[in-house]
Regions:
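Soluble catalytic domains of enzymes that build or remodel membrane lipids, polysaccharides, and related
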Residues: 1-154
Length: 154
């Protein structure tokens, strides 16, 4: 799914590059693997807000009663996507602040969802700080990571 940087570069161009490289892009669509619904919701174009819960509910074949993961660039609209049937959201966007002291700002904006795994009332949200940088090619005062998530049936 797209994020803000793909929008900055030109979403269609970025999507075409990914697809030419053989990457399956879930842009407001879903795939099902062993009964697990994996939903990708693309970042809003031209800065207009996006209703992620409506996007999830509008995806053909989405069943709120089945296990599901939402891939969305920013850790936002958590109660709404939970109400739509999502049980795990995986996001990024915050870069964990990237350069000290910006981490304080991301914590202020995204609250407890600014980094790591947070579980609340039937939904888990994982926000990856990522490994890269935006703007200056540097990271200070935070720890980049490559995340491995192992899912186990309940």
């Amino acid at each position: 799914m797209t994020g803000n940087h793909e929008i900055y570069l030109g979403a269609e161009r970025a999507l075409a590059v990914a697809r030419r490289a053989g990457i399956r892009v879930l842009e407001d669509e879903m795939t099902v693997i062993d009964g697990l619904q994996i939903v990708g919701v693309g970042y809003p174009r031209r800065g207009e807000p996006k209703d992620n819960a409506a996007a999830v509910r509008g995806i053909a074949g989405f069943d709120p009663g089945r296990p599901s993961i939402l891939l969305y660039h920013s850790p936002v609209q958590i109660p709404e996507v939970k109400a739509a049937g999502v049980r795990l959201q995986i996001s990024g966007h915050t870069h964990h602040g990237q350069i000290f002291p910006v981490g304080w700002l991301t914590r202020l904006i995204y609250g407890r969802y600014y980094r790591g795994l947070n579980e609340e009332d039937g939904i888990a949200v994982y926000t990856s700080p990522g490994t890269g940088a935006w703007g200056p090619a540097m990271r200070t005062g935070n720890t980049p990571e490559v995340t491995v998530i192992r899912l186990k049936p309940r």
